[in-house]
């Protein structure tokens, strides 16, 4: 959890707006995980996009093998950023690996690149070109 928090908060600049643990019947019913005790950290970006980091304290699991962009199911998240080139350089300096440097999309309206968060989630970073 700490590595993911550092990635999203410290490196991508998202703001923590909630940090709590929940083992109530509500969370167990909603998630469908009996006995769930979940540590949740909710973050938001400047544009209002919100993500939740979840760690099931009651059901520890190893980090799965990284999914590929072409695998079926939810495989990546996309976050809009203001200065992709600068962010790319900062993340490289922190040891984050990318598939390619920021690249203009085929439609020409955005620069994009992919990296992985500390748990292997594909993160697409997008800068809209004005």
Predicted features, each with a name:
Residues 1-48, 86, 93:
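Core segments of cupin and vicinal oxygen chelate
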Residues 24, 58, 106, 129-130:
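A short acidic/small-residue loop/turn micro-motif
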Residues 1-2, 45-49, 55-122:
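Vicinal oxygen chelate
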Residues 19, 53-54:
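Short, conserved beta-strand edge motifs with alternating hydrophobic and charged residues
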Residues 54, 126-129:
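Anionic group-transfer/hydrolysis microenvironments
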Residues 21, 81, 127:
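Residues that line or immediately flank small-molecule/substrate-binding pockets and catalytic motifs
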